[in-house]
Curated annotation (Swiss-Prot):
Organism: Desulfosudis oleivorans (strain DSM 6200 / JCM 39069 / Hxd3) (Desulfococcus oleovorans)
NCBIfam families in alphabetical order: L9
Record HAMAP family: Ribosomal_bL9
GO biological process: translation
Official protein name in the record: Large ribosomal subunit protein bL9
Amino acid sequence: MQVILMETVEALGLAGTEVKVAPGYARNFLFPRQKAMAATPANRRRMEQMRAKIELQIAKERGAAQEAAKKLEGVVCRISAKVSNEGRLYGSVTVGDIVEALAARDITVSKKMVLLRENIKEVGTYPVGIYLYKDVVPEISVEIVADEKAE
């Protein structure tokens, strides 16, 4: 089913674009939440009239994301965890741990925004991406330090 996105949907595309989706996804998710409308000739004309407004909204969102990226760039987040004598963690550092550590520094991000490339199971420094907008993904450093040595 062809639909026109009325707002940016992360998995599909930017507002104002026409995409093909499963009919059930359109009927049960996109249409009730007013995130998309059916791609009829009348709706295409309506979207052309709204295109300038949508482009302005996209520019604002991208600008806000780029400002936030400047603040996040170069941030080092330190997390202490219990480790063994070999430097391996008991368990692992999760996305939730990273979100909590950033919240302690007055940086608000959701778990969905944190892009963890690998499981963190050892002491060290790891690069972690923070998804802010489609092409705005600043990297922070997460440093895992030993809390106390286990016997």
